[in-house]
Amino acid sequence: MSMTSPSPVTGGMVDGSVLVRMATKPPVIGLITVLFLLVIGACVYCCIRVFLAARLWRATPLGRATVAYQVLRTLGPQAGSHAPPTVGIATQEPYRTIYMPD
């Protein structure tokens, strides 16, 4: 036994089950969308966690620059000096260019 009611637009009879399906469709679509976004968000979160835990970020150009900056900061003030490098620490012999014959 089907419930029918007059349609306000056409004046004809509309089946009640169609109205019920149409009324429940937007919330179901919204629920599916929210669940889909949660799953995508969880996947992105897990990928970022693995990326950071495996230290893969160091392989990127920004990661290499970051590591180089950290190393330079740990070296202290001697890293920025412009003094020529020395060959022997005890003798303080200055660095000399060695020319190779052709």
UniProtKB/Swiss-Prot annotation:
Q: How does it sit in the membrane?
A: Single-pass membrane protein
Q: Which UniProt keywords apply?
A: Host membrane, Membrane, Transmembrane, Transmembrane helix
Domain of life of the source: Viruses
Transmembrane residue ranges = 28-48
- Localization terms from the record: Host membrane
A single Gene Ontology CC annotation of this entry is: membrane
Could you tell me what this protein is called? Protein ORF28
Give the originating organism: Human herpesvirus 8 type P (isolate GK18)
